[in-house]
């Protein structure tokens, strides 16, 4: 009963903050359930927003925007020929994913990465998928990105797919869908880091109280992975970009 009373109290505290908010029909709403109640893992964040009040909340959001601007975070659109920079649109309210749901999603994405690694290793190795008729040879050999000189070449550490990103989204029923795989030039990690820096500095109390999962372990793992490929102790690892006119 106590848990139910606490939930009802939280719903009451944040009600003024959400006045006029209505979920879109036919679309899964991250914040509200079907009954129009705020999901439990969103309640602490919205309660803190409500406690800050509109004036203080606007000031915090403005501070986050200044951080993004001062850091020089921009992006470009491929279709535009001018190459003009656009300010990075910071979302002041982050997407919240419950810890248990994140563990499920993380396990599924790790499994997908292992599958893509196996496919890539086979394409440049034994080619069983082609020989067994599971994948037409033209799909691989006819792909302009297929690097024939690398067939039979063992990569350092035995791993082909070192860095992998994936676009995910919700189905209308709330299930996670994979919308796209990013294996050639995965981008987004830098934007995620800048988003986190901007919001955590503008609202340090919010991030501290909510015990948000840290991003540092990811970047530490990337650094360790790249450094592990280095056979010399005194050399440095450099990450090259496509250049200043690239979208990201």
Predicted segments, located by residue:
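Preference for protein termini
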Residues: 1-248
